[in-house]
Amino acid sequence: VLLSFLLRRLSPPTALVAFSILLAFAETGLGQGSETPDKPLSAQEADVASVTGEVLIPKLIHWCGDCHQGEDPQSGIRVDRLGRIPRDREILLWEEFREQIVQGKMPPEDAPQLDEQEKAEWLEKCEQMLHVAKSLPVPNRGGSRRMTVAQFQNTLHDLLDWQVDLTARIPPDAISKDGFTNHVESMGMSPAVAEAYFDVADHVVSNSLIDPSQPPAIQAFQMAFGRQINPAPCPDALVLGANSLLLPNSDFVVTENFPEKPFPYEPLRMQRTFRFIEGYVGNDTIREWKEFESIYHAVFACMRGTPGYPVGLAYESAPDGLLLRPAIPSPEIFGESNTYGPMANFKISLRELPSQGRFRVTVRAKKLEDAQLLSESDLLSPSEADPLSVVIAAADLGNGLQIADDGIYQLDVVAPSMEGRKEVRLLIDGLPFTHAIAASTAALPSDAASDQLAKVAGTPMLRIRLSKGEHEVAIDGPGAAEVEALCWRKLAPLSKPATDFEAFEGYGPFVGVHVGLRRDCGSTLNPVGPAQRVASTDWSDLVFEGAIENFPSPDVEKNNVNYLAGIREIGVRSEYYDGRPVPRLCIANISFEGPYLTQWPPPSHQQLAGNRTLESIDQNEVREPLGQLATRMFRRPATADEIDHLLSVYQKAKLGGSTNQEAYRDAATVVLASPSSFFLHEASLSDEAEPLSEWELASKLSYFLWNGPPDDPLLKLAESGRLTELLDQQIDRLLVDPRRERFLQTFVRQWLQLEKLDLLAIDRKTYPEWTRDLKASLRQEPIAWVGHLLDHNLPASHLVDSPWMMANEVTAAFYKLPDRPSGGPSFELLRTDREQLGGLLGQAGLMAALGDGRQSNPIKRGAWLARKLVDRPPEDPPPNVPKLPEGDISKETFLEKLNRHRNQPGCAACHEKIDPWGIPLQNYNASGCFVDLPSSETTSQLADGTKITNAIELKKHLAGQLADQVAWSFARHLACYAIGRDLTYSEAAQLKTQVETLAAARYPMRSLLRTVIHSDAFMTK
C-alpha cells in the first residue's frame, strides 16, 4: 500500500529509496530500541525466579485462582500469567497482593481462609523477593518514538516557516492510559500513518519550492470609512442576498494601494466587470443576464447580523471612521450561534482573496472619546451633580452649547409628550450618539425663566466628558420632534456617577479579526489570532496575520454566474466579553495584503533550498543545501553518508529525466519523510544506562517544554558540549519563550482530560449562562492556573486549594467576582475570599466536564481525582456491572442509590477507591458552580479514616495532609509526558525520593519540573 502511494507521488527512484528507508527502520522495532540476544540469568535473578515460580505463584493460584484465572478474571488480573522475575508494573502488582493479604482482603470472606503460619511464611518470602527484585537493573536499549501530529506540525512551522495547518491530513494520535498522546506504546507506524506523513512531506516541499525568477502576484486593498467619505459612490442599488444590510457606499471607499517591496512583483488587481444571471436582487428569484461594472460589486461593507442591539446603535458612521459597539453573540442553537452571527457584525465581503500564502490584515483604529448611554433609573441625586444646569430649548440648539468648566456632564432629555420609546440621535461636535428614550417626568414651562430652567428634570440619556468652551449640538431621529429641551448637569468629581464614567472611559475595546466565507443565512468565520486591545484615543495600527489555507473558503466553480456565489469575508469586531459598558471602537480603515511577503524567495523556500534558483543550479552545488536541510530537520549534524544518500536520490531522479527542481524536490521530500525527521531517537550502545548525547538532550528538552524542535541557541550549546552544564539556564529560557504555551496547552489538557469539556453538552435551559464563549474560557482556566504556578514556582498545594485564582472577563462575570479584570480574554491573577474557588477543584469547567450537563456525577469526579491529583487510580470497572435491584427507588437520595449499587458483588472494591473523593464534590452542581447542600449529601470517609464533610474540607485536606501525594501525582504525570512512556519501577522510586527533598519548601512547581528533567528517567537512555 505504501509503495503504491509513493510511486504515485514521487519519481520511481525516490519512491524506492523512501520505501527502503521505512522498511529498514521498521525492522529495528519502532519505539522499542534494538533487541539484544538473551543472556543467562544473574544469581540474583535466578533467586527471584526460583522463589516466585516455586513458592509464591503456586500459593496464589491455590488461594486466589477461582477468581483470578481463566478468560474473565476479576479486575483483569490472572495469577497464572505472572512472570517469574517481576519488573516494573508487576512489582506494583506484587505489592498490591501483599497488601491485600496483610489486610485480610484476599482471599475474600466467603472463601477458605489462610493458615496464619502459612500466611506469615508467604509474606516473608514475598518481602524478600520484592527487596531483591526492586534492585535488579532494568535493561536500557535507547529507543525511538514518532512525533505526535502536533509536534510534526510545530517542527514544520519552526524549521521551515510552514504556516498551513496540516494536522487533519494525519490520523489522530492514540491516547495512553494517563491521557497522553506522545506515549511510545501508542505511537505506532501503520501503513496509513506512514502514507500520511509522506503525503505531508510531499505537500510541504511541493508548495514551498518556487522559481525565484518568477515574481509573485500580490493582492492589496484598503477600505476607508467616514461619513460621506466617498466622492463617487456606486450609482447602483447594492444588494447582497437575503436580509441585506450594507453600509451606504457614500460612507466607505475602496482603493487598491500596492506597497513598495525590495523585489519585483505583479499587482493582482480585483475584477471590476461582471455578468450574472441570478442572485443580484436579494432573496428574490430572477433569471436574467445583467452586467455590472464597479469595484463596489466586488467589495462590500456588510453589516448583516442579529438585529435588536439592546443599547444604542450597533454601528454608526462618524466623520473620521466607522463606530462599532461590542459584537454581542447571537443566541445559540445546539451549541452553535444562530444564522446571521452577532450584533454589530461588520464584515468586508468580497469576491477575491488569494488561494494560498500568508496574509496580513491591518486595522487602523482608536478608542472613541465616547459618551456612556444611560437608563431611566440613572437619575442624579442632589449630591451627585451641581445644582445649576445648562438647559437648551430644542429650538435654540443652533446657537451651540456653552460649557463653563471642563468636566463630566450628564444629559437629560426633556420630552414629556413622547409616546412610547423612540430613538433620538444627538450630534456633539459631529459625533453621533443614538439612544432610545421614553417620556420624561417633568415638562418645560412655556414661560420658564433662567432660575426655573435650572430645576428642569428629564430622561437620562448619556454622560460625556466635555471641555470648556462652545460645542456644536444637533438633534434628529424619530423622537427628535418631541424633544423640548436638553438639560446638562456637571457631575460632582468624586460622586459615584463620575467614578463610574471614569471607569467606562478608562476601558479600551478589543479588536478581533475573523476570516471565512459568506453563507446564504450567515457566515462561517474563524479568528485570526487573539483579539488586541485598543487602549488609546489616538490612531494605532493593529496587525493580524495568518495562512489563508487555515480559514474557511467557498467551494465554487470558476466564473459562477450567481451574484452571491463564492463570497469571502473579513470580519472586524469590537469583541464582547462580560457585558460592561465599553467605549465604541472607531475604525478609520482596514487594509489587506496577501500573500504577505517581505522577501523573495520567501523563507519557506529559503529553508529548503536557500536563495538558489533550482533550475540553473549546478549538480555540484546541490550537496550544500541538501546537507543544511538534513541537519535542520534531523536536529543534529547530518552525516556524510546521509548526505551522499540524498545526493544519490537527486542524481537518480535527474537520470530518469526529471528537471533540476523536480529532482531537488524528490531529495528534499526524502529528508522530510525520513524517520530522522519525524522520530525522536535515543541511540544506545548497550544494555547499560547511558547519558543522552547533547543533541538528544536538546531535542528531548525542546519537545518537552515547547512541543517543538530546538532552536539555534540550544543546538549551538549541544554542538559545544555545554548544554548539560547550562541545563538549568536553558530550562528557564525555554519557559519564558512564547513557545512554552504549546507545552502548557498540550500537557495540561491531556493530564486533566480537558477534552471532556469539549464533549460536554450543558443543559442550556437550566444553565443559560453557559455560552460557547464561556465554555472556551473555562477550558483555558486550568491551563492559565498551572502556567501561573510554574512561572512563580508556587507550592504544589495551590493546584488544589488557593486564595488566588486566574480569571478573564468572561469567567469573572460567570463566577460573579467583585473585582473584574479588564484584559478581555487574557487571564489575570485575582485574590478571592470564597474558599470554594481557587485551585483546580474550584474551576467550573473541570467540575462540569465530569458530569453529563444535567447533573453532577461524584463517581466520575472521584475517579478523576484519584487518577489525576493523588495518583491512586482505581481499577477499570468490570465489563458487566449489574443493574440496581428492582424496587421503588424514586424517593431515595443519590447516596442511597449509590450505596445500593456499591453493595453489589463486583462493585464495592472499586467504589471504595472512588466514592470518598467524589461525594464531597457534590457541592459543585452540573454547571460547576458551588451550591450549599446538607452535609448528609456531601460527607465521606477517606481510606485513611479522615472524615470529609464538603468540598471545601476536601480541598483543605488535599492541600494539607495530602500535599505530598498531590505533588507526586503532578511530578509523575509530568515525567511520563516528558519522556513519552511510563516510568519503570526503579525510575519512579528514584524520582519519588528526589521529589521528597522538596517537601520542606512545599514542593515548588518549577522545582518539581526541574527535578523531572534532572532525573535519570529523563537524562539517560
Predicted regions and their residues:
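Bacterial N-terminal signal peptides
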Residues: 13-27
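N-terminal secretory signal peptides that target proteins for export/translocation
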Residues: 1-10
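Low-complexity, glycine/serine/threonine/alanine-rich intrinsically disordered linker
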Residues: 30-77, 89-96, 100-105, 109-1021
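Low-complexity, charge- and small-residue-enriched intrinsically disordered regions
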Residues: 9-17, 403, 466
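Short, aromatic/basic-rich helix-turn unit that serves as a nucleic-acid recognition element
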Residues: 80
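The substrate-binding groove and active-site-proximal loops of carbohydrate-active enzymes
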Residues: 83
